[in-house]
Amino acid sequence: MKLATLKDGSRDGNLALVSRDLSRAVAVPEIARTLQEALDAWDVAAPRLEQLYAQLNEGKLARAVAFDPRQAHSPLPRAYQWADGSAYVNHVELVRQARGATMPAEFWTDPLMYQGGSDGFLAPMDDIVFPDESWGIDFEAEVAVITGDVPMGVTLQAAESQVLLLMLVNDVSLRNLIPAELSKGFGFFQGKPASSFSPVAVTPDELGGAWRGGKLHLPLITTLNGALFGHPNAGVDMTFSFPHLIAHAAKTRALAAGTIIGSGTVSNKQGGGPGRPAASGGVGYSCIAEQRTVETILAGQASTPFLRFGDRVRIEMLDDGGHSIFGAIDQTVSKS
């Protein structure tokens, strides 16, 4: 099934079911007022939601209305936890290669992960607002999952059953603030402002055979100012599956229902080399930083600028029939 959170003036919005074709929506306060409320009692709420979802897709719910993604929050407007991994080690390897650093062997066996701010996410069509372009504004197109209650020490096998919903992410990053921040040895904070998520979150069964092995095997499409920037396949070159990321996060702590785990920037090796931009016939990249990294490797310096005020970023994933699965993250960068 497909779920969204509609804006109603409150912090957490109203939970709604969205039809498979993203055309219709219906609020479900009789089951749960918010997505978090549904997640807290998923075993009870999910069967009732599935029943209504079937009726919605059959056109049997007279109270359904047209679904307008502009009226949608991120599925969880705020969350108990947002932990973003770096499952595509190719991305990390390229960044290190560009600065002449070797790749530690453990990066292939032990995932990187940071804990981001989750007290308030951007809506999928909100502007990305900052006072200064010089901060190095960038997008990161990713896939994320929402978990149920995950016990500490969960096994890989059990972790996959805790993937309740999937969605897309724009992990907004401020590249020029990150180096000084990381040099302190205490992780991201200012360099990782509020992220945004797709208008709709979907259960794994909606993805059919594209969801297998704890990975989503479909291209993740990013456009910048209407031009294709990247369409790498999210299931290719994903070193760590979502169950692996969940188990990593839960090694020393339990994860509450509603925890969001991100994949990190989707990145494909493209024939074993640094790859090619989409404009040159390659699958391109899911963030500007990776394209700049490849430019540095090949030409000695980066030439693609980071985002500027007025730039528009769109992130979307289509099924095999060309239909949008999650709706689009569609944001414009603007000056505060």
Q: Where does each model-flagged region fall?
A:
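Active-site microenvironments in enzyme catalytic cores
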Residues: 1-12, 17-21, 29-232, 239-244, ...
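Active-site pocket scaffolds in enzymes
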Residues: 261-309
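A beta-strand-loop signature enriched in Asp, Gly, Thr, and Trp
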Residues: 212-264, 268-280
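Residue-level recognition of short, solvent-exposed, well-ordered loop/turn junctions
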Residues: 83, 256, 308-309
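Structural signal for terminal/edge beta-strands and the immediately following C-terminal loop/tail
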Residues: 313-336
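Short, surface-exposed secondary-structure edge patches
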Residues: 79, 134, 251-253, 303-306
